[in-house]
């Protein structure tokens, strides 16, 4: 759905052949938008700007959207949208469950690779960003009608499992007695033994061979470790209120059977060649080759990632693949996509994108660490935030802080600041939603004293917006009209901070409206119209928060 500003700009460009570059007016008396297109054209045409502006206005056919354009100053064109048009468009948001989000003309199958914790280790701060960002993409693209296929590429394979399983066997431990934190401690203990005892290290390597060969006892312990880990991961996903489930898990081990075929195809196509005993793919413009099979015959992460692309295109029928990982992996994905296209695993009509994110920093501006210098577990991070606010508010603070800046930027985790209900924070948006809800609930109780105080506000009949005489009303309605277009931009560019900025502006516009335009104290048609405007605002705020994965409370 094109917003009113976009429709207006398109109509003007169609009339004059130039993008008018509409900008929000600096003051209400100048209308809603200004354009300096006449000043730009005047330089080219060597004519007075006001004369050029007059010619432009004469060509415009926008009476169905705007009041008569005005020429101001040296040649600015001021435009004011018609109040009845604003009212009609904003009224649609009162009852539309999707709040104006248009369904994609050509729905796609979109694979999103995110979260990806490692088995036998607790999720840490780095997984926070991948999980929250990927979940936001999942919600936004699903809202547009795309089929989203989450892929949780957990680290469930590798030589480290030989070390851990051998330690468990030799210590005669019953691994079922441990939770994820206990298993992580076992991993750390096994690593110390591996580093200190060469004989244990040899036995651990032989255990890897047993794992790869399908030894029953080794596989039983390995599968138990995965089950314990998934239980821990799911507990964290539940705390984070994200959409990932066990059905989305596609661990490294799931590609094991595909790896020989992938390498054979690369060799057959002349892409993989032997170099110092390893099989490598040399890519033009890259300093180092991609190693798809190591000297010892083992397959590395690159081969697994190629197999994943091959399956996601071939079996999952992906039209678009999105990877959400640390920005420091950008080069890896650049090479991966190049090789996948060279091999034909990634056709030209399938889009592949890596969305990199920055680090989480402590209040001191340094990478977030424990006092001992270790990695902070995600559960400890959530516990820290919940010492400052209730769980749903703390989570809103964390998610909004994560999503509201450009993703590649590092951000400072300052729980005390993030949970504030003032300023550019998640709790501020929650408070705005609760405040709108409170007004509507009071209005419903005044109309019917017997109304259920817990009744669904969205299910009530709030009528339509019919009166927009005040600038604050018009500005709020204008912002509402942009919501669908903002979501479209976020879905295309994968820029959730733009949705955060929009929602913050919307909450601010509602605050101005609340101060300048009494709702419950107004009467007649004005009161009904303002209540409908409140209902539309509540719906858009709630839908927008949901796309960010943030709870929209009716009370705070």
Curated annotation (Swiss-Prot):
PROSITE patterns documented for this protein: AA_TRNA_LIGASE_I
EC number: 6.1.1.19
Highest rank taxon of the organism: Bacteria
Motif 'HIGH' region per UniProt: ranges: 117-127
TM annotation in the entry: none
InterPro entries: aa-tRNA-synth_I_CS, Arg-tRNA-ligase, Arg-tRNA-synth_N, Arg-tRNA-synth_N_sf, ArgRS_core, DALR_anticod-bd, Rossmann-like_a/b/a_fold, tRNAsynth_Ia_anticodon-bd
Disulfide feature: none
One Pfam family of this chain: DALR_1
Keywords, comma-separated and alphabetical: Aminoacyl-tRNA synthetase, ATP-binding, Cytoplasm, Ligase, Nucleotide-binding, Protein biosynthesis
One of the protein's GO biological processes: arginyl-tRNA aminoacylation
Localisation: Cytoplasm
Family annotation (PANTHER family): ARGININE--TRNA LIGASE, CYTOPLASMIC, ARGINYL-TRNA SYNTHETASE
Known partners and oligomeric status: Monomer.
Descriptive protein name: Arginine--tRNA ligase
Species: Cutibacterium acnes (strain DSM 16379 / KPA171202) (Propionibacterium acnes)
């Amino acid at each position: 759905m094109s917003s009113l500003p976009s429709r207006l700009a398109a109509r003007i460009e169609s009339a004059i052949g130039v993008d008018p570059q509409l900008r929000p007016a600096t003051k209400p008396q100048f209308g809603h938008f200004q354009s300096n297109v006449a000043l730009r054209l005047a330089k080219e045409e060597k004519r007075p700007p006001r004369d050029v502006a007059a010619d432009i206005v004469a060509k415009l056919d926008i009476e169905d959207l705007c009041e008569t354009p005005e020429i101001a100053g040296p040649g600015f064109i001021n435009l004011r949208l018609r109040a009845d048009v604003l009212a009609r468009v904003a009224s649609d948001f009162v009852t539309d469950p999707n709040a104006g989000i248009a369904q994609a003309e050509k729905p796609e199958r979109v694979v999103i690779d995110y979260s990806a914790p490692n088995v036998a280790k607790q999720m840490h701060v780095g997984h926070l960003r991948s999980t929250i960002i990927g979940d936001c993409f999942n919600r936004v693209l699903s809202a547009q009608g795309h089929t989203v296929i989450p892929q949780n590429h957990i680290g469930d394979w590798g030589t480290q499992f030989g070390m851990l399983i051998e330690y468990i066997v030799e210590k005669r431990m019953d691994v079922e007695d441990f939770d994820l934190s206990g298993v992580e401690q076992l991993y750390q203990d096994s690593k110390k033994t591996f580093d200190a005892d060469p004989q244990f290290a040899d036995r651990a390597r032989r255990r890897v061979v047993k794992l790869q060969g399908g030894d029953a006892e080794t596989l039983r312990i390995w599968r138990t470790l995965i089950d314990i880990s998934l239980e821990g991961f799911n507990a964290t996903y539940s705390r984070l209120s994200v959409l990932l489930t066990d059905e989305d898990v596609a661990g490294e081990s799931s590609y094991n059977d595909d790896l020989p075929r992938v390498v054979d195809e690369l060799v057959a196509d002349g892409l993989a060649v032997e170099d110092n005993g390893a099989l490598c793919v040399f890519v033009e413009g890259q300093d180092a080759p991609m190693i798809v099979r190591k000297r010892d015959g083992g397959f590395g992460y690159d081969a697994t990632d190629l197999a994943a692309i091959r399956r996601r295109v071939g079996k999952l029928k992906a039209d678009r693949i999105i990877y959400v990982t640390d920005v420091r992996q950008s080069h890896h994905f650049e090479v991966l996509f190049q090789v996948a296209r060279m091999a034909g695993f990634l056709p030209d009509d399938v889009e592949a994108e890596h969305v990199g994110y920055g680090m989480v920093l402590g209040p001191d501006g340094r990478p977030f660490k424990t006092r001992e210098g270790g990695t902070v577990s995600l559960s400890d991070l959530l516990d820290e935030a919940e010492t400052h606010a209730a769980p749903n508010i703390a989570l809103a603070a964390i998610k909004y802080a994560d999503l509201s800046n450009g993703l590649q930027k590092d951000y400072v985790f300052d729980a005390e600041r993030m949970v504030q209900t003032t300023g550019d924070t998640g709790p501020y948006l929650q408070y705005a939603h609760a405040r709108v809800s409170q007004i509507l609930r009071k209005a419903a109780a005044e109309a019917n004293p017997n109304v259920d105080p817990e009744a669904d506000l969205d299910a009530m009949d709030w009528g339509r917006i019919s009166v927009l005489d005040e600038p604050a009303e018009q500005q709020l309605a204008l912002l509402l009209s942009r919501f669908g277009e903002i979501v479209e931009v976020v879905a295309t560019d994968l820029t959730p901070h733009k949705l955060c900025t929009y929602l913050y502006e919307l909450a601010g516009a509602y605050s101005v409206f609340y101060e300048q335009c009494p709702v419950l104290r107004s009467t007649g048609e004005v009161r009904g119209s303002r209540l409908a405007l409140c209902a539309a605002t509540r719906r858009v705020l709630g839908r927008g928060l949901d796309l960010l994965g943030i709870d929209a409370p009716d009370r705070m």
